[in-house]
Curated annotation (Swiss-Prot):
Pfam families for the chain: Globin
Protein name, UniProt field: Hemoglobin subunit alpha-B
Keywords assigned by UniProt, alphabetized: Heme, Iron, Metal-binding, Oxygen transport, Transport
Subunit architecture: Heterotetramer of either two alpha-B chains or two alpha-C chains and two beta chains. The two major hemoglobins, B and C, associate upon deoxygenation to form a trimer of tetramers, BC2, that has a much lower affinity for oxygen than either component alone.
Span of domain Globin: 2-142
Binding site for heme b: H88
Length: 142
């Protein structure tokens, strides 16, 4: 999926805003996912997924750090996310529909915490980016 110059700018800008707060923002995105889609908790049965848990904070940070890595590799998402894609498809066997659910919650968190930066154009760019990340992650399911 090609990204325009303005897409790249907006993706990079939003990631720079997110990067210092990956634990907090990631935790909120994960908690929103679990609250709005409780069935997603089944993939984390080995963790304490209650509000404020260290496990949710760590998982959220892991997710957002992977997104940060992807944001620096927009032209090579397949290579950048290959190991993560393999893990989700073959080891964790996560329902690929859950990627979309998490992406939606990440967008909600961005809109809440960065309203000045989350313009309609930035929203569209980051949504496009997260869709490309999701598509890359579930590419190994085929």
């Amino acid at each position: 999926m090609p990204f325009s110059a303005s897409d790249r700018h907006d993706i990079t800008h939003l990631w720079e805003k997110m990067a210092p707060n990956v634990e907090f923002l990631g935790e909120e995105a994960m908690e929103r996912l679990f609250k709005s889609h409780p069935k997603t908790k089944t993939y984390f049965s080995h963790l304490n997924v209650e509000h404020g848990s260290a496990a949710v904070r760590a998982q959220g940070a892991k997710v957002l750090n992977a997104i940060g890595h992807a944001s620096k590799n927009l032209d090579h998402l397949d290579e950048a996310l290959s190991n993560l894609s393999d893990k989700h498809a073959h080891d964790l066997r996560v329902d690929p529909g859950n990627f979309h659910l998490l992406c939606h919650n990440i967008l909600v968190v961005l809109a809440i915490h960065f309203p000045e930066d989350f313009t309609p154009r930035a929203h569209a760019a980051f949504d496009k980016f997260l869709a490309a990340v999701s598509e890359t992650l579930y590419s190994k399911y085929r």
